[in-house]
Amino acid sequence: IVAATGIYSYNEVPFQFRYTGRGLLFDVAEPMVELFVKDIREGIADTGVKAALLKCAIDEPGLTDGVERVMRAVGQAHVETGVPITVHTNAHTRSGLVAQKVLAQEGVDLSKVVIGHSGDSADLDYLRTLADAGSYLGMDRFGLDFLLPFDARVNTVAVLAKQGYAEKMVLAHDTGCYFDWF
């Protein structure tokens, strides 16, 4: 089991960060970076369990102010610690490209980034662009056929593997239980 730290938000930052940070009411260093680095170096919430992965998200709402702030904090924590990053993305809006751009601006080595949910797309140009920039493709969510049918997922993985991208794909699924609302 590998613990992660980060913030999973499609829009805003959690309330405790809303007024604290560069240029805000309480103008101090970004507190999310401090939190993430502490989780990695000392442990999460004084448990002694150290995070070994950073996580952020960008989905259909796009690069909102909150999403960008979290993503930049994740990037800065990565630069400070070297811990890899996984990003929840929306393949249909090609948000993996936006995530790569923001993280690269923060100095992130894109070969340390998994672009999650890349497997929701059969757009080979999009997927090759992500991989060619250095990131791993999260070919996940097998079984969530309403996002992309199983056969299309398998075909996409097979084609990319034949094209030399086998080492740039992480095969997984993104659900561990039954969801009655899917």
Where are these regions (language model features)?
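Core alpha/beta catalytic barrel or barrel-like domain that forms the active/cofactor pocket
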Residues: 4-14, 54, 88-90, 114-115, ...
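Short acidic/histidine-rich active-site segments
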Residues: 140-141, 166-182
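Active-site core of metal-dependent hydrolases
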Residues: 80-152, 177
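Alpha-helical segments flanking ligand/cofactor-binding loops in enzyme cores
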Residues: 75-76, 128, 158
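Short amphipathic alpha-helices and their capping/turn segments at secondary-structure boundaries
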Residues: 35-46, 153-167
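Solvent-exposed alpha-helices and their adjacent loops that cap or buttress functional pockets
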Residues: 46-48, 79, 106-108, 162-163
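Active-site gating/metal-coordination segments in enzymes
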Residues: 1-84, 136, 142-146
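Short acidic, glycine/serine/threonine-rich loops at helix termini
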Residues: 13-17, 99, 126-127, 180-182
